[in-house]
Amino acid sequence: MYTNSKQLSIDHTIFAWSNQKGLNPIHVEKAKGVYLYDEKGKKYIDFSSQLMNVNVGHGREEVTEAVRKQMENLSYVCPPFTTDSRGRLGKKLAEITPNNLNKTFFTLGGAESNENAIILARLYSNKHKIITHYRSYHGATIGTITAGGDPRKNEVDSQQVPNCVHVENPYYYRCPWYSSSPEECGERAINNLEKTILYEGPKNIAAILMEGESGSSGCIKYPPLYLKKVDTLCKKYDILLIIDEVMSGFCRTGKWFGYEHHDIKPDIISIAKGITSGYIPLGGIIVSDEIVNTFNDKALPLGLTYSSHSVACAAALAVIDIYEKENLIENTVKIGKYTDELMDKLIEQHPSIGDWRNTGMLGCLELVKNRKTKEPMAPFNADPSEMKIMNKVTAKLRELGMFTYSKWNFIFVAPPLIAKKEEIEEGIEIISKAISIADEFCY
């Protein structure tokens, strides 16, 4: 049965970001806690919470029950109607964000959230340009893939959506300005950002869009005060600050949202992933009162058929309840520190580890061929011929019973926030065995 289902999936569905020929996906029969199980009963530890979204772990009966109850009572009404789950979730989000962010427009996921954040920023400001980082990912719609710096956008549309401007990240490990400290790298990045603002014209710039904490671009840690200074520039030049919390939100970094590490107050926050822990698609933009109030006497031209879906909102309420009752913010801090300790030991054992970057439980190993030269095990935007070593590493991870997200020379470590110390130990032991393959290519 399951073998047939796997083949049906290959024959009749399209796989994202993949060659459609030669696929051999894991066929998942069930999942529980931090583990997946295939059709043969093989267990895989999920070390990236799928795509950094299954924060409360797999198979939570509380979420299933909340969804069941909501569907028995009311499955769907269109966005002009109100529902209990919609109202309660909106109120809860207002409680866990700054006191000037009181209303949420609900979407179905992260890309839609960022797309609508950009649209809203342009509508409110009557300006058109958006500034983002080169090394960033904000979604794969035609607007968000352009806004992000992911080079795969060039295959989608060489023209791209106009008026998106990119700046260098304060990526200290590979600092574009060859800085001698994270602080210096951050200061030079701020200087570069301000010059870009002046070149592009503050009167033309609607918003700066940045992640609360860097995610799939390699968990590039912001230097001290960097995001605070970005916020200062936004206020100086009357530019909105949109913070993308799709991946870093909902306890993933040891706080409700990643931006809380940086003492800033965004104008718009984009959310998705952890809001429902992936159980049902849901996203949103949490918007400042100042922006929302400009539409008190004119129609807001945003809309989605499934916005404020009652079942998705019920799932989100159940997930947020788990975050609070199980103190997952505290657990994330504790397990994140323990992971850092284990990684310090791993670095001593493996010359292929160039850098380890982590905030809470959003971490990434960067593999290199030489620590001194920092030659990557696979380059930025690597083509298939340049991925041979990393493909061997990821194949070994799978063989040893691990699923985790990897990209270029990055291996991500972002397990569900319910993970225990022994599960972290299990996962890191598997990673250690797999990256021994990469060690053989070091010089």
Question: Model-predicted segments: where are they?
Answer:
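Conserved N-terminal phosphate-binding loop of PLP-dependent enzymes in the Aspartate aminotransferase
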Residues: 1-443
